[in-house]
Swiss-Prot record:
InterPro entries found in the cross-reference section: Ade_phspho_trans (IPR005764), PRibTrfase_dom (IPR000836), PRTase-like (IPR029057), UPRTase/APRTase (IPR050054)
Protein name per UniProt: Adenine phosphoribosyltransferase
Subunit composition and interactions: Homodimer.
Gene: Aprt
EC numbers on record: 2.4.2.7
Keyword Translocase: no
NCBIfam families noted in UniProt: apt, PRK02304.1-3, PRK02304.1-5
Pathway: Purine metabolism; AMP biosynthesis via salvage pathway; AMP from adenine: step 1/1
GO molecular function, one term: AMP binding
GO biological process, one term: lactation
Cystine residue pairs: none
Catalytic activity: AMP + diphosphate = 5-phospho-alpha-D-ribose 1-diphosphate + adenine
Similarity comment text for this entry: Belongs to the purine/pyrimidine phosphoribosyltransferase family.
Transmembrane regions listed in the UniProt entry: none
Species of the source: Rattus norvegicus (Rat)
Length: 180
């Protein structure tokens, strides 16, 4: 991983204390999205990791609603594979499968179209940030319902103090930037 590219990405992450509630330090990726060089570097770094780890053995990138959609298609293009979308409940047409997960204030559900993947296809799940791991864990469950193989989960940012990586169990996880 090129240190200068990683520094370029890291410099574009802003921190906002006490947002959205007191005691939370929010990591904002908006400056990264505004800067084409930084965004391109983030995609190159994630793709470089996946190429070195999995070679050509990835069939699809699965982007998580909603900020995973910002990285999923570009990452898929860089790898020469397709991209599928995992959406919040009620956002996809046609037959879907769903998985629910807990939020601090209730439950939520993710869905994917039933015909999005074939059994045995190798998939990498991408999101902008891993916090508690609930969303990414639900996405893994969803893809297992389709009998796809989740070969890895990746994100731009990981909030290590929330231990989301542990929720993923045996599924490998990679992040470009780690914050407490």
């Amino acid at each position: 991983m090129s240190e200068s590219e990683l520094q370029l990405v890291a410099r574009r992450i802003r921190s906002f204390p006490d947002f959205p509630i007191p005691g939370v330090l929010f990591r904002d990726i908006s400056p990264l999205l505004k800067d084409p060089d930084s965004f391109r570097a983030s995609i190159r770094l994630l793709a470089g990791h996946l190429k070195s780890t999995h070679g050509g053995k990835i069939d699809y990138i699965a982007g998580l609603d909603s900020r995973g959609f910002l990285f999923g298609p570009s990452l898929a293009q860089e790898l020469g594979v397709g991209c599928v979308l995992i959406r919040k409940r009620g956002k996809l047409p046609g037959p879907t499968v769903s998985a629910s997960y807990s939020l601090e204030y209730g439950k939520a559900e993710l869905e994917i179209q039933k015909d999005a993947l074939e059994p045995g296809q190798k998939v990498v799940i991408v999101d902008d940030l891993l916090a508690t791991g609930g969303t990414m864990c639900a996405a893994c469950e969803l893809l297992s319902q389709l009998r796809a193989e989740v070969v890895e989960c990746v994100s731009l940012v990981e909030l290590t103090s929330l231990k989301g990586r542990e929720k993923l169990g045996p599924v490998p996880f990679f992040s470009l930037l780690q914050y407490e």
